[in-house]
Amino acid sequence: MIGRTPKLSELVLGETAEALSLHCDEALENLSDDDEEDHQDRQVHRERPYAVSVPCKRCRQTISFVCVCDPEAIRTLNRLLSASLSLVCPECCN
């Protein structure tokens, strides 16, 4: 640069622009066994048994069962049983 104000013609680029790959070469499969075990442990600790009791669609007899799932799954089951999903007892199936 010559003078007090820079001029575009005086700028000299030292390097030319090159295309740069932004692709990440890491893979989730490369997790160590410890990381996978930690993830599985966290998942297992989130799952717990839930007792569910619902009336039979036909005879209104109570149907009870226990399922093991995480809190999100039991909320989904609750929404389904409250809306469109109905269960039928073994006697009414025949």
Swiss-Prot record:
Segments carrying motif LXCXE motif: 22-26
GO biological process, one term: symbiont-mediated suppression of host innate immune response
Annotated region described as E7 terminal domain, given as residue ranges: 1-42
Localization terms from the record: Host cytoplasm; Host nucleus
Gene Ontology CC: one annotated term: host cell cytoplasm
Major location category of this protein: host cell
Posttranslational modification: Highly phosphorylated.
Matching SUPFAM superfamilies: E7 C-terminal domain-like
Molecular function per GO: DNA binding; DNA-binding transcription factor activity; protein domain specific binding; zinc ion binding
Similarity comment: Belongs to the papillomaviridae E7 protein family.
The name this protein goes by in its record: Protein E7
Organism: Cottontail rabbit papillomavirus (strain Washington B)
Name of encoding gene: E7
